[in-house]
Structure formats: structure tokens, C-alpha cells
Amino acid sequence: MNLQTMIRTLQDYWSEQGCIMLQSYDVEKGAGTMSPYTFLKAIGPEPWKAGYIEPSRRPADGRYGENPNRLFQHHQFQVVMKPSPDNIQELYLGSLEKLGINPLEHDIRFVEDNWENPSLGCAGLGWEVWLDGMEITQFTYFQQVGGLECFPVTSEITYGVERLASYIQDKENVFDLEWTEGISYRDIFFQAEFENSTYAFETSNTDMLLTLFDTYEREAARQMQEGLVFPAYDYVLKCSHTFNLLDARGVVSVTERAQYIGRIRNLARRVAKTFYESREKLGFPLVKEEGGKRHE
């Protein structure tokens, strides 16, 4: 099964489970969790079921295309369901079966790995899913997002697209993966991987990046004062990516690193609070009424 077919199979499966299929969000981010389709939608009582593939940029992980499985940019297939279904783990195993992986014939383990994203004020109960000794998925029940307690609980399934495809295609090197017939992962991404690694470690203008971080931080705060959650959150994401670029260049000390993460976290918490208040003011319109009573 090539990578393109694998993604389409996951999309079809989760669509059948009631998830809407979205396109990736168009601002740089380090993980699919940071998309507003997860971060914001996990806040408050309104139900939400969605799936999307998310390119995730992690500058410090770039290896110029020379490492078989560490990348400046990788892909995640993200599934979020709120409230979390009681049978979410069974649904996940069903998705593997659709990919031709019979749980009865493979060693599939849920290894406890509670999750935290300090820069966004997020935390949850979590497990890594290991398939025959290889981690392929992160499974999380959100307890806190943007410093706010999550109720109802949102379940998040994050498939590592390249890792899962490497297992299915029995490839040792991600660049040897078949994206679709006659086209390899290398054909599409190798040059970008090499050049982005060069940028992240060698040529980025750190003075400019330091200025950009401050500028993005101010703009995020200004948009929140206007009550504009989504523009503000875009600039929080830009702060996060800019910090990651600075971190990759090694220009941020240990003390400064904690300070930068704290600044991003403060912005994320303000966004979360503002978003909750804006939805509350609207009466949480996506909450369904059953028998004349609100179902929360």
C-alpha cells in the first residue's frame, strides 16, 4: 500500500465514524495538536469530530536528508473526537485493520506516556502505540488545554504518517517510501529537507528572528484585545515556530528557553480563555439539545 492510498484509507475510515475531514492548517506548527482544529476545538462543551493530515515542522530534528527517520518536516494524521467515545481504542484498532494490519497477528502495545505541551499549557493521559516494536501512534485523552480543564474529555489519535508507512511498506529509510506509483518520498521532499535543514542550522538570520518573535507576540496580544481569537492564535503559532528556529540555531540559553516557552504559554492561555468566553457568549451553539435539555 503506497502512502497516498494509506492516507485515503484513514480518511475514509474515520469519515465513516462521523469525523469531518479537513485540510491542513496553513500556519507553521510543530505538531498536529497545535492546529486550531484540535487546540481550540478541545475547549468548552461543544462536540467535535474531525480528522486531518498536518505537516509538522521541527527545525531541530532536521538532518539534511541524511538520517533515515529524522526530519525537519514530517506528517501526522490527526483524529480528534469530543466527547471521547467509550470504544475509542477499538475504533483505532479497526483503523489498523483497514490498513491490512490484523491486531490478532501482531504485537500491538499501548505504552503509558502521559503527554504535555508546556508552551501551549496542554496536558493529558497518554499512550504510545507500538506495532511490533515500532512506535506508530500517540493516543491522548486531553485533561487541560491552554490552562483550561477539558470537559467533556477530547480523545486525540496522532498517527506518525512516515513511521506507519515505513512499517506497511517495509522500508528502513523514509526517503524510499512510495508516495504513489512511480513517485517516491525522496522525489517530493528531499531537496526541501536538505535546504530547510541548512536554513535552520546555518543561514537563518537570528537577529531578524528575535525581532519577529517580539513583533508576533505584540500582534497576538493586540488581536486578543480586539476579541479576535483566530488571528491572535495564528500569531501564537508564529511565535512558537520562530522560537523553534532560534532554538535550532543554538542562540537561546537554558534560562532564555524557559522564558520564551513561558511567553508563548501565557499567550496560548489568553487565547484559550478568550475563545471559551466568545463561544459562551454565543450560547455554545454546537451543543445539541435533546428533549429540551442541553446535552453537555
From Swiss-Prot:
It is an enzyme of class 6 (ligase). Keywords: Aminoacyl-tRNA synthetase, ATP-binding, Cytoplasm, Ligase, Nucleotide-binding, Protein biosynthesis. PROSITE patterns: AA_TRNA_LIGASE_II_GLYAB (PS50861). It catalyses: tRNA(Gly) + glycine + ATP = glycyl-tRNA(Gly) + AMP + diphosphate. It is found in: Cytoplasm. One of its GO terms (cellular component) is cytosol. It holds the Pfam family tRNA-synt_2e. Its EC number is 6.1.1.14. One of its GO terms (biological process) is glycyl-tRNA aminoacylation. HAMAP family: Gly_tRNA_synth_alpha. PANTHER family: GLYCINE--TRNA LIGASE, CHLOROPLASTIC_MITOCHONDRIAL 2, GLYCYL-TRNA SYNTHETASE. This is Glycine--tRNA ligase alpha subunit. It comes from Listeria welshimeri serovar 6b (strain ATCC 35897 / DSM 20650 / CCUG 15529 / CIP 8149 / NCTC 11857 / SLCC 5334 / V8). The lineage of its organism: Bacteria, Bacillati, Bacillota, Bacilli, Bacillales.
